[in-house]
């Protein structure tokens, strides 16, 4: 049996704020702010194949093979300047519920992931079922990783059974985690400006 699929998904978050102000701008402050935009999209292509294998057991074994290619994209856009601006008045700057995303923190990143996987399962006896799976993934930004899983189920009676699984795993950070950047600029003691930053993993600092 063969199965092929192509799927696309997109998620967008438009971050805005109403009925607030930037106190450091005084009367010039708007009461409505655009704090930033966040967009993630994913395009995935899959090809799977399954067949029966006869090893002389009471029931055939099943072998599944597959390949996957995935493209991921993440983008952020800055908010309007009043949402993070430091005005002439010595008061908290930025929109009061939280400042907007600054232009220096805008991100546009993408990556590609290619994967191969295989799964073999069989009823070894009338009471024992076992399966083994292997997967290999190659990330354009994180390198490659191989994982595996072994599972078994033994039925003592039709009503009572024991199951065991051992596996390894790997999860690369999402693009939203690794590429996110955020800056808060405010006045410290004596009116001195200071910045607190959340930096992406690509930042040399």
Describe the function of each predicted region:
Residues 8, 19-129:
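Outer-membrane beta-barrel transmembrane domain signature of Gram-negative proteins
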Residues 10-14, 19, 71-76, 80, ...:
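Surface-exposed extracellular loop regions of Gram-negative outer-membrane beta-barrel proteins
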Residues 110, 114, 137-147, 169:
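Solvent-exposed loop/turn segments connecting transmembrane beta-strands
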Residues 4-10, 63-71, 116, 132-136, ...:
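Transmembrane beta-barrel strands of outer-membrane/channel proteins
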